């Protein structure tokens, strides 16, 4: 009778969002056998967060608006994309550098709006003007003219954070400019200082390490490169090692045939963002901001994908630093943690179909408690809060969900 009473008390505590660290392993083991409890405890270990162990600086989370192929974002869609209080909280906008200077001004309204919300704007060129190309290759004799074209664009739109001179130059048969890593390096070495904005490169199709390393072997190009960027089509995020540059993932989408409201697909994206951050990367940029499969749909609604992105973008702001954290402490649970001053933000992806109790330990920071925000198949950025005592606590993660903890 006493054992049953203890079990029932712990059940009540857990499902009330208990943050106590005093639940014993024996009690947890007993709970897992209780016929009315669906909480998962299998292979659960503590997620250890060391806020004193600093990793990469985070630049943000964002998406693309490409006017050559899609109508511009509306005012309402810009707010929903970039507002950290009422929208997704994107802090990066990616745009296309047009081949015609007559189209430069069309980019400016959304660029200005994104900047107004504090977002960084990065611009990628798919092609140089045709007069500067032979087929799908940039003429070496046109390097200076192409740099002047990029610089003119930067001036026309009021300045961007960085420019990529080539989009997926290693994607053979794409229809846009192709170039070897050596060729991209040669252009940046010769003209990277004349493009009007800092250079991001080489932006390969599949974040190809060999391509990136070959590009960076050009010491002059490397010195003129602000940060390395690339896309993860066909590639699982991975750590590029000590390349001496911040790494941005500047384009990807998971499935264009599935609605942005498909919950399983949204959870796939959640894990992908986790993987990018856990690989030491500084930024994650989705493909189209507004698309049926994107974070905002064609009817201007924030989708489930958008709310999943918001679990990162709203709370992990540019300038936050990722800190050491147990990445996969329990079966189906993935954790990253970030710090800004004394504030700690923890993002947890729970892939399990059952409520999962996850314990945490903290060092290097002593919060009094957390605001908890979570998104699952039925809730969007739901909120509650809890206090903690000491350097350890535990919480319930709702089934198939993304949870963000913000210290207070």
Question: At which residue positions do the language-model features occur?
Answer:
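Bacterial Sec-dependent N-terminal signal peptides
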Residues: 2-5, 15-44
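N-terminal hydrophobic targeting/anchoring segments and the immediately downstream early-domain regions
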Residues: 34-108
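Substrate-binding cleft and catalytic face of glycoside hydrolase catalytic domains
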Residues: 48-53, 85-216, 220
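Structural recognition of the beta-strand scaffold that forms the well-ordered cores
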Residues: 57-67, 90-97, 120-125, 161-165, ...
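Noncatalytic carbohydrate-binding groove/subsite architecture in carbohydrate-active enzymes
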Residues: 177-270, 279
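Aromatic/acidic polysaccharide-binding cleft in carbohydrate-active enzymes
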Residues: 249-316, 323-331
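Carbohydrate-binding surface patches
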Residues: 328-366, 400
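C-terminal beta-strand-rich structural cap/linker in extracellular carbohydrate-active enzymes
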Residues: 386-408
